[in-house]
Amino acid sequence: MQQVYRGAFHCYIKFPHLLYQTGLSGHQNAKILIQLDTEPQNFDYTPENHLLNKFDVFGNIRTTPLDLLLAQKITAFIKRKQPKGRDIYDITFLCPKTRPNYVYLSQRLGVSNPDELKSILFDRLNSLNLNQLANDVSPFLFNPNDIQRIHLFPQFVEQTAF
């Protein structure tokens, strides 16, 4: 594992030979690399404790509150130079669970209410090719029908009470 900090925190975790040892690759030198990139958000919040009981892991983990996570995903969708279908997927996944943190959205996007949020989302949508974004995210979807989250995002924004 290698950790680097230059304005953002980068962590690279390599699993050499794992693909070969598990029979997933015939090449001994094949490796899996997991790259984690984070950057300071300069936004104070209280992490939530969540009991994790999956994947043979049982214990408490600290998590970002869902309202803040949704606001961060919306901000990423609006500000990314290269849009990602995964941002749309995440927004449609999180919205039924919470409302966005408007303090964060106000600081990052100058958005302080649902009408302003819808307006900025539609402005961004006008410049995007949803078919391209759907193709971008489709290899990562467990359920192929979830591609509709991308295709129907304009209707989702219209109907959602942010």
Provide a role label for each language-model segment.
Residues 1-162:
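Structured mid-to-C-terminal alpha-helical surface segments
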